[in-house]
A protein has these predicted regions:
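Extracellular/luminal ectodomains of metazoan preproproteins built from arrays
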Residues: 479-480
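N-terminal signal peptide
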Residues: 10-21
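Mature catalytic domains of secreted/periplasmic carbohydrate-active enzymes
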Residues: 19-444, 452-468, 473-476
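Classical eukaryotic N-terminal signal peptides for Sec-dependent ER targeting/secretion
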Residues: 1-7
């Protein structure tokens, strides 16, 4: 049972003279409804599956692997979706077309697709979307416009216009019309600076064609999120560790328009949520390979990475690759199910929670006190700012726990900058969409928690922190 929370909110005295002398603050950029929903849900399951799966080690197909190599014998996209639900994800993101250009749907724009494979009547994208709808998951496609290795192997080498036009046609097939319905998100890898990198494209084609492709996607599917593009951008690593502190405000990159970020700060003019990807496989491989060596992280390790990504305000893509038969290995499913059950038990049954509260920031600022209703061995706190309505404000904060025997005791900032699995402490800086703090339960438990904003960012209303929620939890043993 959730204890009824007693909430005490204190504000510092106003300082009218000091305030009058300060320059007018900037208005806080706010997320779109799609960005808010994307961040509030926390994480997605990434599914790397394609021609690379049918090799022993190829992670980056240059387009030379024969289409006939694609030959799944037990494809089960329902199993993928059931696994995503079991781990607690709200969406699945599927490699509809990876770097080599092989399309997992029968594209009329290309001669390098499932139509030329060993299973020419199989539309994997179609099966994937149907499974997403069946299990209540949002569908997402990995389909980067700079990645089409097979096309670049053709003679004569395609022009920029031919290259870009094929991509636009593929987006029409995936996002336009009614064939697959609304797609929540597309994911652009290495974009827009990958030309000449993992997959070549015509000289000078990118980032020059970036705006054209953005505008085309906006036209055919206006509410589809473009991730690692104008709606969400990468934190800069694939280690399963989000940036911290993390501000979701940025300034434009001078080389690329359409809201591609160049620098991040608490007072940037554009709101841009962040995302990070990581693979479940200990090898670090994104695709499953028939080496006999692929092993999954265990549930506790998955939690450690969740804590360092979702728990620090970053959207997390956890990659769970099917094997060459077309199913996710049972050993992977087992660990994800254990993790998902433990996460749900922890998050969905808070000891106490309060919504929509505010407190002033700064030295001598206000505080929010949360009563637990009893003495409880709380060892986790989740904080969320009301980013959708008031933007991101908090730059620094403190947490204290009240012991009936010892009074108020500070919960210390983490000594581990990554808040690693097994580590503990209060993050203590930014909050944004979410921050999760874990710490050893006080000996004898506590009956109250107190939160205080000690510094704010530089947006309008930055002197007041608005929390969408403040909750106390006892972690499931798997997460300790």
């Amino acid at each position: 049972m959730i204890a009824r929370a007693l909430l005490l909110v204190a504000f510092a005295p106003s300082r009218a003279a000091a305030t009058a002398a300060m320059p007018a603050p900037l208005p806080a950029p706010l997320p779109t409804p799609q960005q808010s929903a994307y961040m509030d849900t926390g994480f997605s399951m990434f599914v790397h599956f394609g021609l690379n799966t049918f090799t022993t080690s190829t992670e980056h197909n240059d387009g030379s692997i024969p289409a006939k190599a694609f030959a799944p014998t037990r494809l089960d996209t329902d199993q993928w979706a059931a696994t995503a639900k079991a781990m607690g994800a709200y969406a699945m993101c599927f490699t509809a077309k990876h770097e080599g250009g092989f399309a997992l749907w029968p594209s009329k724009a290309s001669n390098y697709s499932v139509a030329q494979s060993s299973v020419p009547t199989l539309d994997v994208v179609g099966e994937f979307v149907k499974s997403c709808r069946k299990f209540g998951l949002q569908p997402c496609f990995y389909e980067s416009p700079v990645e089409n290795g097979h096309l670049m192997l053709q003679k004569p080498t395609p022009t920029t216009e031919q290259f870009v036009q094929q991509e636009l046609t593929m987006y029409d097939e995936l996002l336009g019309g009614s064939q697959y319905g609304h797609i929540e998100r597309i994911w652009w890898d290495h974009y827009p600076y990958a030309c000449g990198g993992l997959s070549s494209c015509p000289s000078g084609s990118f980032p020059a064609s970036y705006n054209r492709i953005v505008e085309h996607v906006r036209k055919i599917s206006p509410t589809t999120i473009i991730s690692n593009g104008p709606d969400s951008q990468w934190v800069g690593n694939t280690r399963g560790v989000g940036a911290y502190p993390i501000w979701n405000y940025c300034s434009l990159d001078t080389e690329v328009s359409s809201k591609f970020c160049g620098a991040w700060s608490p007072h940037g003019p554009i709101y841009m949520p962040r995302m990070e990807g990581y693979s479940l496989q200990r090898s670090g491989h994104w695709f499953w390979h028939d080496t006999g060596l692929e092993q999954a992280l265990n549930a506790s390790e998955i939690w450690g990475h969740w804590l360092r990504t979702v728990g620090r305000g970053t959207h997390w893509l956890l990659n769970v690759p099917p094997n060459s038969t077309g199913v996710i290995p049972e050993a992977y499913v087992k660990q994800l199910t254990i993790f998902g059950s433990a996460l749900a038990a922890t998050l969905e049954r808070p000891v106490a929670i309060v919504h929509n509260v505010s407190a002033s920031c700064g030295p001598g600022g206000g505080s929010i006190t949360l009563s637990l209703g009893a003495v409880v061995a709380v060892d986790m706190v989740q904080l969320r700012e009301d980013v959708a309505n008031t933007g991101q404000t908090v730059a620094n904060y403190t947490l204290e726990a009240h012991s009936p025997a010892k009074g108020w005791l500070p919960l210390s900032p983490s000594s581990d900058p990554e808040v690693a699995a097994g580590g503990s402490g209060v993050n203590g800086q930014t909050i944004g969409h979410r921050v999760v703090d874990v710490f050893p339960a006080l000996e004898g438990g506590c009956d109250k928690l107190r939160w205080r904003c000690t510094a704010a960012g530089q947006q309008e209303g930055g002197g007041v922190a608005h929390l969408a929620s403040f909750s106390a939890h006892v972690r499931h043993p798997v997460l300790q």
